A protein has these predicted regions:
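Short, well-formed alpha-helical segments that are part of the catalytic scaffolds
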Residues: 1-10
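Active-site donor/metal-binding and catalytic loop motifs
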Residues: 3, 191-206
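Acidic donor-binding segment of Leloir-type glycosyltransferases
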Residues: 9-51, 56
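Cell-envelope/extracellular polymer assembly enzymes that use nucleotide-activated donors
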Residues: 19, 160, 175
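Long helical/loop segments within the catalytic core of UDP-sugar-dependent glycosyltransferases
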Residues: 38-75, 87-170, 181, 203, ...
Length: 207
């Protein structure tokens, strides 16, 4: 979490156009880490909000829905805790939204620790197949493809128009993706824009 928040603070984007939300449903020491990093961002002049939920209703979908209530911007950039975005990534993505029908822009996942173990190498192989082959082919051929839950930007009005984040599914990203595309929102996949992430290094992390 600390690494992600540091990377977000280094994004090359005007502070007055950026709101940072830390959505924390943790039940361990992560809560204290989030509070420390929140204060650092606040002291550095960021528009930042820390939302810690105790009930965890709806899990990730519930956290995203809750965050939407106070999100100020028109575009929502979602990052899971194990991702580390490059500083220029927003400049490579945001201009696609000049098309009013673009509802989502997805980047390809990279792998910080691909060579760590057999498990990480296998995960990387399958994920690369999904991203570099399946997602790319679906996007370029005009077929439906899904937002991968992280490392992408969604237009807030597209989320609202498509019915928002739903709690009655374990794949809230896939669910929203298809509802949005059925509403004729365009999705764009950027195979050449990579957002690095850490793969679970062992079976405990993989679970």
């Amino acid at each position: 979490v600390r690494r992600l928040i540091k990377a977000v603070s280094n994004l090359d984007y005007p502070k007055d156009c950026l709101q940072i939300q830390i959505l924390d449903d943790s039940i361990d020491e992560t809560k204290e880490i989030c509070e420390e990093e929140y204060q650092k961002l606040l002291d550095s002049g960021f528009d930042v909000e820390l939302i810690h939920r105790k009930d965890r209703v709806g899990y990730k979908a519930g956290a995203l829905e809750n965050g939407m209530e106070s999100a100020k911007g028109d575009y929502i950039y979602i990052l899971d805790a194990d991702f580390v975005p490059d500083s220029d990534v927003l400049h490579k993505m945001i201009h696609f939204f000049t098309d009013d029908r673009v509802g989502m822009v997805q980047t390809r996942w990279g792998h910080i620790n691909k060579s760590y173990s057999i498990l990480t190498r296998v995960q990387a192989l399958f994920l690369d197949g999904h991203h570099a082959v399946e997602q790319t082919a679906r996007s370029r051929s005009g077929r439906f493809f899904n937002f991968n839950g992280t490392a992408g930007i969604l237009r807030k009005s597209a989320i609202i128009d498509s019915g928002g984040w739903q709690h009655d599914t374990i794949c809230e990203d896939l669910d929203l993706s298809y509802r949005a595309q059925m509403k004729r929102w365009k999705f764009i996949y950027l195979v050449d824009v990579v957002t690095p992430a850490e793969l679970p290094p062992n079976m405990d992390g993989f679970k």
